Amino acid sequence: MGDNLKKRSSMTTDGDNRAPNRAMLRAVGFTDEDFHKPMIGIASTWSEITPCNIHINKLAEKVKEGVREAGGVPQIYGTITVSDGIMMGHEGMHFSLPSREVIADSIEIVSNAMRHDGVIAIGGCDKNMPGCLMALCRIDAPSIFVYGGTILPGNCDGQDVDIVSIFEAVGKFNAGKISREEFIRIEQNAIPGAGSCGGMYTANTMSSAIEALGMSLPGSASMPAVSSRKANDCYEAGKALINLIQKGITPKQILTKKAFENAITVVLVLGGSTNAVLHLIAIAKEIGVGLTLDDFDRISKKTPHLADLKPGGKYAMTDLDKVGGVHGVMKYLLKEGMLHGDCLTVTGKTIAENLKDMPDLVPNQTIVRKKSEALHPSGPLVILKGNLAPDGAVAKISGLKKISITGPAKVFESEDDCFNAIMTDKIKPGDVIIIRYEGPKGGPGMREMLAVTSALVGKGLGEDVGLMTDGRFSGGTHGLVVGHISPEAFDGGPIAIIQNGDKVTIDSSKNLLQVEISQEEIDKRLKSWKPIEPRYKTGVLAKYVKLVQSATNGAITNLL
């Protein structure tokens, strides 16, 4: 241990010319000995604005202890987070996906400016995970991601409840299915404390994907936020990073095409969020791996859906943790030949080596099925194409009895207009809702539609109405819904010229998304289509519109 591990920070601390730099560092606690140790950046997404992140400062301190114990000198710094749950359903959601880019940019800026020899990033809410990983890819110093952990379920009248319970209660209350008293009780009990939303929603999906990628320690993905195990996970991550520096292992050696195939497989088996498609493509682009919708389609067709997890199933992430966690699932998949066991990880060992001594899934548990008893023989994330989405779209079919619908289009130019129509009973069984100008540029920010989809479920329309959009869906969404339609309406995609009453089809069994009008009619309408003006003229969203790429490219803003 010593100066030979300071491959980056030596330019900040070494030599007579760096005396002013060292003077500044002494003021924040550095000693003479510290200048001979590797400098470690700890990127914390702590914030008081969301339960997903409210505990992360304590976790960052545990990481700091581990780094110190292993011979490094740690520096905690902050980056932003927003709360998808709190922003949902209003103008604030425009800022959600752009926050991913700001997280990535800010971590890249700080750790490259300080010349950190290694970086540990700690994330909680949805956009933290991909934002942190994108930054670690750009920096490409030895790095580890630590997940803040999943929330414990709430309890209302003896039943487990969570964030989706209260979103769906809005529709139920409006439809007269529950009393105001029950409505209020659900609100008061849905979120009991710290941690990320508890089903296989976006945060838990991405934590699982990151463990499968090899960028977090085995077992990290499914641990509850409030637990001694999570605190120890953080401590061990701090120690493990010094091992990575000693071995010279960086994200570029870990994040290979096969690693991304592992992540996709785990997401599909668990019934993960559609957002994983967007985020994994974005992370892959940052590290220089070619990953496309076709890869998701190829893997989905041969990967069964095995885990009975919310939103389409019964169980929460804490339930999965009790029967073996994500690493238990991965061990089963490796035995079944469904994972690449030779992929390197942040332990310095391969996936197969990590899993060798990990426990199997608990016998006779009912959360994760065997391949022979799969919930569905193929993956629940389905890539659709057709004359409505020439470049592709993404659907999720887990928990659905119907996976196709043909019906008249009900067209809305924004999520807000659609939500009002649902709440005033203007949507009927058999309708196919079109919400457009909600894409990366058109929204801007590709808003999530949990308020809309939950209102449909609460109204009893979840199985009888289709919904398609160039926006996104929350990991908590379930129903016959299609998002990420590309090209988006703002760019003149065919979704821009659909008219009320056009017959449209969502057919997940055929990977088809189409409007039943002739190509000549589509071309005619597109010729008369006029682009809309950007909704924001100044500020971060105006800048975002100028930089953001399509959903099929991960909605990245990096100039790759």
Swiss-Prot record:
Cofactor binding annotation: Binds 1 [2Fe-2S] cluster per subunit. This cluster acts as a Lewis acid cofactor.
Modified residues annotated as N6-carboxylysine in this record: 127
InterPro entries listed in its UniProt record: DHAD_IlvD/Edd, Dihydro-acid_dehy_C, DihydroxyA_deHydtase, DiOHA_6PGluconate_deHydtase_CS, ILV_EDD_C, ILV_EDD_N, IlvD/EDD_N
Spans annotated as Disordered: 1-20
One GO term (biological process): isoleucine biosynthetic process
SUPFAM superfamilies, sorted: IlvD/EDD N-terminal domain-like (SSF143975), LeuD/IlvD-like (SSF52016)
Catalytic residue list: 474 (proton acceptor)
Catalytic activity: (2R)-2,3-dihydroxy-3-methylbutanoate = 3-methyl-2-oxobutanoate + H2O; (2R,3R)-2,3-dihydroxy-3-methylpentanoate = (S)-3-methyl-2-oxopentanoate + H2O
GO molecular function: 2 iron, 2 sulfur cluster binding; dihydroxy-acid dehydratase activity; magnesium ion binding
Necessary cofactors: [2Fe-2S] cluster; Mg(2+)
Keywords: 2Fe-2S, Amino-acid biosynthesis, Branched-chain amino acid biosynthesis, Iron, Iron-sulfur, Lyase, Magnesium, Metal-binding
Binding site for [2Fe-2S] cluster: 52, 125, 197
Primary enzyme class: lyase
Chain residues that bind Mg(2+): 84, 126-127, 448
Pathway terms, separated by semicolons: Amino-acid biosynthesis; L-isoleucine biosynthesis; L-isoleucine from 2-oxobutanoate: step 3/4; Amino-acid biosynthesis; L-valine biosynthesis; L-valine from pyruvate: step 3/4
E.C. no: 4.2.1.9
Summary of subunit composition and partner proteins: Homodimer.
Family designation: Belongs to the IlvD/Edd family.
Primary role: Functions in the biosynthesis of branched-chain amino acids. Catalyzes the dehydration of (2R,3R)-2,3-dihydroxy-3-methylpentanoate (2,3-dihydroxy-3-methylvalerate) into 2-oxo-3-methylpentanoate (2-oxo-3-methylvalerate) and of (2R)-2,3-dihydroxy-3-methylbutanoate (2,3-dihydroxyisovalerate) into 2-oxo-3-methylbutanoate (2-oxoisovalerate), the penultimate precursor to L-isoleucine and L-valine, respectively.
Annotated protein name in UniProt: Dihydroxy-acid dehydratase
Organism field: Leptospira interrogans serogroup Icterohaemorrhagiae serovar copenhageni (strain Fiocruz L1-130)
